[in-house]
A protein has these predicted regions:
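Structured, active/binding-site neighborhoods that engage oxygen-rich ligands
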Residues: 1-324
């Protein structure tokens, strides 16, 4: 591939994150009725009063994952967790030297790891720990495994589950990450002739086939039924969509915005103007949108607001050179 798919995906994720930060936690009606109206581009402010172009925990944890992958030339679960600790404790992978907007499940897992140094037990396993904190950071692992021609699909899914499980170790969260990987894989292996909806459907079908081979997955699969048929999901009215921090809401809203729009810009603006967990849903959608439309589809004025853009570009270039 001539383009840098790492940059396509990661910059899509980071721009989506930064676009959503200023309106995070707001209801759709609150956003629309602001003095400035709906989101049209990068803004400052928000719950954490950050400068325009600031990425949050989504971008930081994705960058931490990518940094570990580049440095180790593979997925090293222990090192990924160490990178998360550097983010939490030292503010690494942030633009201003301090982590913010940390999710409860991620924080709990990180401090459990700091105490016990055990990657097998640090992740949260209860059903109430199915937020979107592993889905938001899984993209670098997905790209790496989509490029891997040697590892079996079963082992790839296990790796994705293990990366999720560092913080979110319930099957529902791991399955969401597995379906996200399947969509990334479909995007990177499409011939470019099919629609985005059809490519994502191909990926979802592949993921569902994998999970359908084990009856122990059947109950959890029922939570993903809206993704089974994207033609039907595309017909869903916005009032019937939810865009909160629950992993099911996040992946549904991200895919819905992708298949009901025709550009990266339109997709991300649609996401953030839905309200609620705007930064994370936009990061999840942005990663896929970036892979489909390419980094050149991101408005230049949006990119211009991202401080430390060069750091992201350099890290993605290192990844590109390692996996040509």
């Amino acid at each position: 591939m001539d383009r840098n798919i790492w940059l396509d995906g990661m910059m899509g994720l980071i721009v989506g994150d930064a676009l959503g930060v200023p309106v995070q936690f707001m209801e759709k009606e609150e956003i629309v009725t602001r003095e400035v109206g709906s989101v049209k581009g990068m803004e400052s402010g928000g719950a954490y009063n950050m400068p325009a172009g600031t990425w949050s925990d989504d971008g930081s944890m994705a960058l931490a994952t990518l940094d570990s992958i580049v440095n180790n030339k593979k997925i090293d679960l222990l090192d990924i967790m160490e990178c998360f600790c550097k983010w939490e404790l030292e503010g690494k992978y942030t633009q201003y030297g301090e982590a913010f907007d940390q999710g409860n499940t991620c924080t709990e897992a990180i401090y459990r790891y700091i105490k016990d140094k055990n990657i097998d037990t640090c992740g949260c396993t209860d059903e109430n720990s199915n937020g979107n904190g592993s889905l938001m950071r899984i993209l670098p692992a997905c790209i790496l495994l989509a490029l891997d021609e040697e590892t079996s699909e079963d082992d790839k899914m296990k790796l994705i589950h293990n990366v999720s499980g560092l913080t979110h170790n319930h099957l529902r969260s791991k399955m969401a990450c597995g379906l996200y990987y399947a969509m990334v894989d479909a995007l990177l292996h499409s011939e470019g002739e099919s629609s985005l909806k059809n490519i994502l459907q191909t990926g979802i079908d592949k993921g569902l086939k994998f999970y359908g081979m084990d009856k122990d997955n059947y109950y959890e699969m029922t939570h993903f039924t809206r993704l089974f048929h994207l033609d039907e999901l595309r017909q869903t009215e916005e009032r019937d969509m939810r865009s909160g921090g629950y992993v099911i809401e996040t992946i549904e809203a991200a895919v819905w915005c992708l298949i009901t729009t025709d550009s990266l810009k339109e997709c991300l603006l649609k996401v953030v103007n839905m309200g609620h967990d705007t930064d994370t849903v936009a990061a999840v959608a942005g990663g896929l949108a970036g892979l489909y439309y390419g980094v050149d589809a991101i408005p230049k004025d949006w990119l211009g607001e991202i401080t430390q853009e060069e750091y992201v570009e350099d890290l993605c270039e290192k990844a590109r050179l390692l996996w040509k």
